[in-house]
Amino acid sequence: MEKYERIRVVGRGAFGIVHLCLRKADQKLVILKQIPVEQMTKEERQAAQNECQVLKLLNHPNVIEYYENFLEDKALMIAMEYAPGGTLAEFIQKRCNSLLEEETILHFFVQILLALHHVHTHLILHRDLKTQNILLDKHRMVVKIGDFGISKILSSKSKAYTVVGTPCYISPELCEGKPYNQKSDIWALGCVLYELASLKRAFEAANLPALVLKIMSGTFAPISDRYSPELRQLVLSLLSLEPAQRPPLSHIMAQPLCIRALLNIHTDVGSVRMRRAEKSLTPGPPIASGSTGSRATSARCRGVPRGPVRPAIPPPLSSVYAWGGGLSSPLRLPMLNTEVVQVAAGRTQKAGVTRSGRLILWEAPPLGAGGGTLLPGAVELPQPQFVSRFLEGQSGVTIKHVACGDLFTACLTDRGIIMTFGSGSNGCLGHGNLTDISQPTIVEALLGYEMVQVACGASHVLALSTDGELFAWGRGDGGRLGLGTRESHNCPQQVPVAPGQEAQRVVCGIDSSMILTSPGRVLACGSNRFNKLGLDHLSLDEEPVPYQQVEEALSFTPLGSAPLDQEPLLCVDLGTAHSAAITASGDCYTFGSNQHGQLGTSSRRVSRAPCRVQGLEGIKMVMVACGDAFTVAVGAEGEVYSWGKGTRGRLGRRDEDAGLPRPVQLDETHPYMVTSVSCCHGNTLLAVRSVTDEPVPP
């Protein structure tokens, strides 16, 4: 097992435990079947050996790939391909009563057909073909058949006599005790096709005798007449009572119904969707970016390009801009010819996630690498430069979200696994110690949960699971972990949340935390200095008396300041001494300290009451991010505004402090939409994507 790292138990097979593991050599997720051979009967050991023998013979994209087998602690370990999309049975169950399109049914069916043809070509019977043994890739587009534990290799005999398989898929000849050959697998194939078309099994009954009676009589409900007569006839032929009347696989593949789907499999699966620049058929003036006609749900630009658009040069897939920390205007970061869909800023880190699931980092070049010295007579400091790189050693992992704290980073994979790296001070990495780690390492305490989001504060972390379970770790003073104490923890702790408050999103600040719940309400904990969490119980424009001011909350508490406690909130973010929120109607509210104008009001008032940002009336806001003493907000049409403290480029322009929102100019010549924004201390990262008429793949 030195080559593998166990992640979690994902199931129990016919004869043993099934583990999801990480192969250390290439960081690829694999399945390890652990079969305790010493506790097995002779027949069971033969079945386990048979599975290895069968898997070694097969090599097909629609069959689960075999890697190796070895002995470990008196158990046979079989390493094989991991299919992250679950089983076809689970896919069908999630459809409820929503029937699949015929094209989708055939897309799945012909892949099963190809896999079974490959198996039969090697003189192997599957003998347990069912939707539970048909697996899907992560995009749920490619199917793979697996579980050959009871397969039979036909060496010299043409028929097998043992009765095995799942009862609902057993053929009539097996019910009669007759010998069978490949036609029994074709019966099971018909059962799978029927299940795809009707979302239920062809043969079901309360007990085994009743089930056998149904199978022997061939009694099953017809599939919906929304499907073509050819598909309905194919189901009937596959489920013929007489094995000789069931068509062989080669005949099924030759049917006109299947030919187009088979051609699509060979031409479309695995193809790379390309973007192309549309060339105008007739010369004409450039089209303004607001008149492209494309629609986007994210923040989208409506301005006119600064120059003529040259259709021969396609726009970049995306751009990431950075400002602050000495950058007085947005600097476009190098992109490595990829599309970044989400960004996160830390005290020193700049990170992003690409559409393909890779983690990209932007770093300052080492001293002496060029561009870092002034020429004689120069009066201005050179603009800082950055180099981009992909995080190495994660080739088998798909990242879907990243968050940054002070000198540490957390990332979330598409399988719901959280990995952390960087500084281990305050226990922020969640590994049960304070050790620094340079490479992303799995937070083992959360492997039993499927996580959907992670957020980092300066020195603490919140993580949310698919079932709404909340975990926190790191520094705990001020009650920022929401655990009811001020204690710190170097390992994830489950956070109690009041019943009915289903968490949808988590947010971390310097010394506080928030969770956004399903009805658009917000709970907060930690330091409430200046009422930056909105925990004071205030009516509109009311100021609390000193003894009513809430200075900190050790547990997650509903906001009490109007209108935050009344209007549904879509987005919230926490700065050092202030916070911001966007309501369902697109209004932006700020609360907390206004020392540097970060609340966006005309007067530098000293108030604990939330205020609506001035100057954004009539603009629907969709995103907001808070830095140490400034705020950045994004409108539905892609407008970017900033306000607050302006030193060291915090506002993305050469202004000093600005108490009211002003636009930030991005160097974009094509229509764009803002996909992500992140502020930390005095830095901002913002990602935009070019808007084209062609849809972007999910």
UniProtKB/Swiss-Prot annotation:
Binding site for ATP: 10-18, 33
Region (Disordered): 278-309
GO MF term (any one): ATP binding
SMART domains for this protein: S_TKc (SM00220)
Tissue specificity note: Kidney, liver, and testis.
EC number from the UniProt entry: 2.7.11.1
Repeat (RCC1) residue spans along the chain: 416-467, 468-519, 520-585, 586-637, 638-690
Phosphothreonine: residues carrying this PTM: 162
Subcellular location: Cytoplasm; Cytoplasm, Cytoskeleton; Cell projection, Cilium; Cytoplasm, Cytoskeleton, Microtubule organizing center, Centrosome
Summary of the function given for this chain in its UniProt record: Required for renal tubular integrity. May regulate local cytoskeletal structure in kidney tubule epithelial cells. May regulate ciliary biogenesis through targeting of proteins to the cilia. Plays a role in organogenesis and is involved in the regulation of the Hippo signaling pathway.
Family note: Belongs to the protein kinase superfamily. NEK Ser/Thr protein kinase family. NIMA subfamily.
Listed name of the protein: Serine/threonine-protein kinase Nek8
